[in-house]
Amino acid sequence: MEVLGFLSPELNGPMVTMALAVVLLALLKWYSTSAFSRLEKLGIRHPKPSPFIGNLTFFRQGFWESHMELRKQYGPLSGYYLGRRMIVVISDPDMIKQVLAEKFSNFTNRMATGLESKPVADSILFLRDKRWEEVRSVLTSAFSPKKLNKLTPLISQACDLLLAHLERYAESGDAFDIQRCYCCYTTDVVASVAFGTQVNSSEEPEHPFVKHCRRFFAFSVPRLILVLILSFPSIMVPLARILPNKKRDEVNGFFNKLIRNVIALRDQQAAEERRQDFLQMVLDLRHSAPSVGVENFDIVRQAFSSAKGCPADPSQPHLPRPLSKPLTVDEVVGQAFLFLIAGYEIITNTLSFVTYLLATNPDCQEKLLREVDDFSKKHPSPEHCSLQQGLPYLDMVLSETLRMYPPAFRFTREAARDCEVLGQRIPAGTVLEVAVGALHHDPKHWPHPETFDPERFTAEAQRLQQPFTYLPFGAGPRSCLGVQLGLLEIKLTLLHILRKFRFEACPETQVPLQLESKSALSPKNGVYIRIVPR
C-alpha cells in the first residue's frame, strides 16, 4: 500500500512528472549522439559532429569547399554525418575503382533519401537493383551514334535562337551574363528534344514550359525542415512524403501531364509522322530493345575513347528481345524529367565554365578558333561522328574544363552487403560518396590543379593518366548514361558560337570565379564577358 501511495499521482504528481522529464531528457540526449560512433569504430577520421544534425554546419559553405577541406584534413578516406546518416567519403583512385567497377555488384545503387517524388523517382537515377538494370539496358541502345545524329537538327535549331540572342550583345559591345543566355538555350533544347515542345525562352519568358522550369529549379527545402528531416528521419521522412506540397505538386503535375499528352498523340500517329526526338526514341523501346548486358553499360568509357574513331553502336551486335516488364508510362515520364534536370543544369554550367576559361585564356581560344575554322571547311553540316573525331583540341579544352569544374562533383553508391574495400571494412547499407572535385584537384594526380592546361589531355598524356583519377561523368556500369548526348550538345553549341564570335574578358568578369555547390557546381554570380564578332 505504501508503494501504491508513493505512485499515486494525487500525492506525488510533481515528482513523477520530474522523473519522466529526466528520463525523457536522458533518452533525447542519447538519441542526439547515439548514431555518431560508427565512423570511429570503422577507423575512419571525421569532423566532430553536433547533436542531432551531425556535421551539417561543416557544409554551410557548400559541399565543394567542404570536400576540399575533408581531403586536406583527413586524406583520401574520411567521413561525416548528414544528420544521423553516416557518409564515407573516398577520393583514392584505387578504392574508387573497386567500388565503381571491380565490386560493382555490391555497389549498384545510389543513396536513397526516401524523399524522391514522381516523376523523377521513376528515372534511371533512382531506380534500384534489377529494375535499374532492365531499364538501363533499354536506354543504353537509345544513345547510339545513329540515333544521336537524329537529334543534331533539333539542337542546331535551338542554337540558331541562341546566336540571334548573342548577336545583339555583339552589336552593342556591352558586358553581359552569358550564363543567363545558356539557361534559355538549354531550356529550349530540353523542351524540343525531351518534351516534343518548341519554345523560345529568351523571347517568351512567361511560356508555361519556361515558367515551370524556373519554378522547379528555384525550389528548395526550408532550412528548419531540412534540420528536422536529418535529425528525426524515421518520423519526418514519411511525414514529408504524405504532407501536401502545392508548389512541388503543381510543377510535377505540369510536366507529367505535358509528357503524357505527347505520348498519347504519338501513339495515334503513324510511324512516319512521329517527331524524331529523345522522347520518341524511348517510346520506340517500350516493349522490346536490343539486348545490352551490364558489361556494355559503361557509356563514359566509350565516349572518352572515341577520339580514335567514331564509337561503335552498343546495340548493334544484339537482337531485339521482349522485356520481362515493358517500360511503364511512369518510367518514360521519369526519363524525360531526368533529361530536364541534367540537360538544363549540367549543360548550362559546363558551357558557362568553358566560356569563362576561354575568355580568360585567349591563347587557348585562338588555337581553338583555328581548329574550328579548319573543321568548318570540311564539315559545313556536322554530325555526331564528325564532332567526335574532328575536334581534338576542343576535346582537350572540354576535358580540362570538366576536370577543373566537374558539374556533378560528387555522387554516391550504397553497399548492399558487408564487404572490404582495400582492407577497409564497409558495413551493409553504408553510403560511399565519391569526391570528384577533391580528386580532380589533388596535386598528386594533377600538378598545379588550379591552372587551366588543356595539354593535360593530349593522347599521350591520357595514356599515362592513372585510371579513375578523372571522373566528370562517373565510371563503371552506373556511369552517366547521357554523356555522349551531353558532349554532342556542348560541342555543337561551341562550334556554332565560335564560327561567328570570340569571347573576351572585361572588367565585369569575376576572376577567379566564385562557385556555388548545391546539387551541382555552378558559377555563383554568373559569367560576365563581352562577345566580339569575328
UniProtKB/Swiss-Prot annotation:
Q: Which cofactor does it need?
A: heme
Task: Kindly indicate whether the keyword Transmembrane belongs to this entry.
Answer: yes
Write down the chemical reaction(s) this protein catalyses.
prostaglandin H2 = thromboxane A2; prostaglandin H2 = (12S)-hydroxy-(5Z,8E,10E)-heptadecatrienoate + malonaldehyde; a hydroperoxyeicosatetraenoate = an oxoeicosatetraenoate + H2O; (15S)-hydroperoxy-(5Z,8Z,11Z,13E)-eicosatetraenoate = 15-oxo-(5Z,8Z,11Z,13E)-eicosatetraenoate + H2O
Superkingdom to which the source organism belongs: Eukaryota
Transmembrane spans:
11-31, 76-96, 224-244, 337-357
Q: Which PANTHER family match?
A: CYTOCHROME P450, CYTOCHROME P450 FAMILY 3
Q: What does this protein do?
A: Catalyzes the conversion of prostaglandin H2 (PGH2) to thromboxane A2 (TXA2), a potent inducer of blood vessel constriction and platelet aggregation. Also cleaves PGH2 to 12-hydroxy-heptadecatrienoicacid (12-HHT) and malondialdehyde, which is known to act as a mediator of DNA damage. 12-HHT and malondialdehyde are formed stoichiometrically in the same amounts as TXA2. Additionally, displays dehydratase activity, toward (15S)-hydroperoxy-(5Z,8Z,11Z,13E)-eicosatetraenoate (15(S)-HPETE) producing 15-KETE and 15-HETE.
Put simply, this protein is called Thromboxane-A synthase
Q: Organism, per UniProt?
A: Sus scrofa (Pig)
